[in-house]
Amino acid sequence: MAGHSQFKNIMHRKGRQDAVRSKVFSKLAREITVAAKQGSPDPAMNPRLRLAVQNAKSQSMPKDNIERAIKKASGGDVENYDEVRYEGYGPGGVAIIVEALTDNRNRTASNVRAAFTKAGGALGETGSVGFMFNRIGEIIYKPEAGTAESVMEAAIEAGAEDVQSEETGHHITCAFEDIGEVSKMLEATLGEAESIKTIWKPTTLAPVDEEKAMSILRLISTLEEDDDVQNVYANFDVSDEVLAALSA
């Protein structure tokens, strides 16, 4: 069975790679600036900034771009961004959480609501679908970081809660509040991670057919194209057959 991560790969293959990369860099830079403004500009002293910089590096964001985003936080004309979470239902009753960093709540809310409505879904109140997800930390290592056994051992020692080792890499999860310490201990043993972030993991999945899957794909794509939207999470599940049809 498959879900959002595979859909993101499909979207990136179908879209213009340069445009996708530019959009990703813009969102990463915004998160870095907000993190630096809220705490120390030194990643070693600011856990949120450290995670933001690490993710930027994993996406091959140039060092100059990262440093520029950090320096922007100390400028007098830097925008004030609010962290906002939207929740609602998409096609097929799929629960969706949207995280945004915005300098205009009205604009972002209007755009998100319009995207849901156009897709045949509905934007709800905060908390309307959040209970279907758990907020956790996710740390991803490339396959060459170690064997399944060695990574499992390192993860247990670091205080992680679960490890899934596959051909594509090692996916380590931990409690939301422990991600800073767990990732730091893992780095000492396994080296630099490919990705370190907090996510909303669904507790239950909603199976969808190809038609509904296409509608969800379009909705997620529309949401992620919005400059204010940082992350989109959904609890849909598609069969391997449907995923193959979408990938064609």
From Swiss-Prot:
Q: Where in the cell is it found?
A: Cytoplasm
The answer on whether this UniProt entry bears the keyword Ribosomal protein reads no
* InterPro entries linked: Integrase-like_N, TACO1_YebC-like_2nd/3rd_dom, TACO1_YebC_N, Transcrip_reg_TACO1-like, Transcrip_reg_TACO1-like_dom3, YebC-like
A single GO BP term for this record reads:
regulation of DNA-templated transcription
Keywords, sorted A to Z = Cytoplasm, DNA-binding, Transcription, Transcription regulation
Alphabetical GO CC annotations of the entry are:
cytosol
Q: Name one GO molecular function term.
A: DNA binding
Reading the lineage from the top rank, the first entry is Bacteria
- Protein family (similarity comment): Belongs to the TACO1 family.
Protein name as annotated: Probable transcriptional regulatory protein BARBAKC583_0163
